[in-house]
Amino acid sequence: MLGVTAAAAYDVPDATALLASGNLVQALQACTTAYKSNMNLVNDNSVRWAWGAVGMALFQTIVPPNSTQYPWNDCRTGCAQCSPDDSSYSNSQSNHPGGANFLFADGSVKFIKSTIAMQTYMALGTKANGEVISADQY
């Protein structure tokens, strides 16, 4: 972990107070500075799912695992139901280089490479489109 956790660095208790105090600019600047300095804003990738918030426990298959081309980072605003960290648009992330472990509905765990073909990865993320995917595709 680098420096402080994302929660500690970007926690804002009340959006109204934030606007009134003028700290909104400071909060956005802190987020921008951290992002530009390559501080890993999602520096707790492998444990966020355990927090149980919707945006922490779900992910989509639009962006490949551990994407560096399209990183889905967020800054906290303290608004439990409206900030980016409560969004359901998160990509899968792992501390494993080159991919991530996935738990499948049949109970098996498989390592999915970050270089997986996007059509295959998107098909793995569907429930009822009827795709048949052989294991050699991922």
Regions from the PLM with identified roles:
Residues M1-Y138:
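Surface-exposed loop/linker segments characteristic of extracytoplasmic
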